[in-house]
Amino acid sequence: MSEHEDSLLFRQRHTLAHVLAEAVQRVQQRDVEVAIGPAIDNWLYYDFLFSPEKQIWEEDLKKVQDQMEKIVKEWQDLIRIDVPAEESDYLVNTLMKQKYKDEMRREFLAAWENISFYINTIVEAAKDRVLQWIDENYVKYYEWITEYLQTKYPEKFAGKFVTFLDMCEWPHVGSTKEIDPKSFKIDKLAWAYWRWNSNNVMMTRIYVWAFSNKEELKEYSDMMEEAKKRDHRKLGKDLDLFFFDDLTWKWLPMYMPRGYIVYHLLEEYIREKETKLWYLHVMTPCLWNVELYRTSGHLAHYQDGMFPIMEREWEEFVLRPMNCPHHMMIYANQLHSYKDLPIRIGEIAHDFRFESSGTLKWIERSRHFCQNDAHLFVTPENMKDEFKKVVDLIFDVYKDFGIENYRCILSLRDPEDKVKYHQDDEMREKAENALREVMNEIWIEYTEEIWEAAFYWPKLDVNVKPAIGNEYTLSTCQLDFCLPAKFDLKYTDKDGEKKTPIVIHRAILWAIGRFFAYIIEETKWVFPVWLTPEQVRIIPVADAFNDYANKVCEELRTNNFRVSVDEWWDSFNKKIRNAELLKIPYILIVGEKEVGSNSVSVREFVSKEQYVLSLDEFVKKLDEIVKSKK
């Protein structure tokens, strides 16, 4: 048991999962299948299967919340019993009548001799008062269970009345009096497949926030309210950036014109950065013969994350999940000398991964994405220098976007896992040691974590902690001694001998959509001017000044700025409001005074400053701001 799992807060949350299940049983007169209920991060949840007539919906959650608080205030004691296989069978199948618990019980018995149960109890003398509003059949059911347990375990259950019984191994608090009844709150109702398998039944999942006290709950609740304001899904819809539709498959994003402007600018930005570092950009197909992935090892180690194989004209094809094998083919298409290396092959590549729906999060993680990918073919002599340049590029990009809240992780394989990873211990150890040595030489603070490596190479992951949600990887850089050998890649060294290059895999923005989502949520869509889809909105104070407004617009467009004129019939104030809702950096107001002086009245969205500039002065000012990437 880890220190986290033995902490008071973990035990409180885990007990609240049982309290949640008990509350649902009370609300639905026990007509429910209970499945599993763990504590996770700031949450806990429990999965249920309801009969159609007893299904719980959002409007029922208030009743469940009230029952949870009532149960906690009952100061229920939790009693643990450990029973052998035969008795566990009786408890689960005869008393509880829970088939999903029985499925887990059978699995547990393969590893353990005894099965643990936690039983919620109240003082028996208080039963009639505490349960006076509870369904009579529910009470009779637990009278039957109480009688059995009092007979079987008199020393534990004398004077106790059972209110809930669950099979469980993890630790709990001794009594619900150790839980603040105002320290938790039901958050939402969701859906999840039993055992995370889409071939199984779909269950109802209820999520609950839980903390040590009501103050911590309020702090977290306030943070989540802020998160809703920043959520890229909401902002994407409100600002006409992108959307998802069931007709096109809800995990494939559709970018609107405003959203695609930003998407394209991000592509241009990173491509320009790479070109200055002598990257050679290529384009490779999205659909490949499946033999390519057999050669690379992806089919053996990553097929669950790939789209199904297609067969046409006696050949098998698959949508590519990643670009490594394709860039190996690009390299192999020509002969190379050591003088040619390093060769830096880059691509903004369309990739397709059939990841489970539970891991997907709109454009942050979708089944189709464009990866800012590159593969550097290097010699042992220039490997370290090239790796350092990649790290420098990562932090140069982060500086441009003001990204400061990140951590570096050296991700290594689990040596005990013989399934996930390519089995070449010598090559793997060589790559891990080389990567560790480089990290130490460039003085980057990092932590080492096992299990997170790719199946045939170790990697440096740069994880960001966004303003909302959990941290995730935004950039990655991987060292590979394996794939070049699989594709028999060679270069001629200075002695005329054939050698195998080392490959550095790297993705700076990872996927363009993920990076887009990150900066939306970090900035609340207050983007730097160079990245904003509409940089200037011109608003004439009356129709008489539309011609001048369009003249200003033409001048700005000639200088490659993104600008529009609002000539709609809305009121002047509504036009201002509309521009502010879209968070357009500059609103230019033009009227009689501006026409006479060839000037514009400027309103800045961020600073709220208002001032007047000549048109030439404003063009010069805006040009400097855009070029500075501010």
What is the role of each PLM region?
Residues M1-E33, D41-W43, D47-K630:
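NTP/phosphate- and nucleic-acid-binding module
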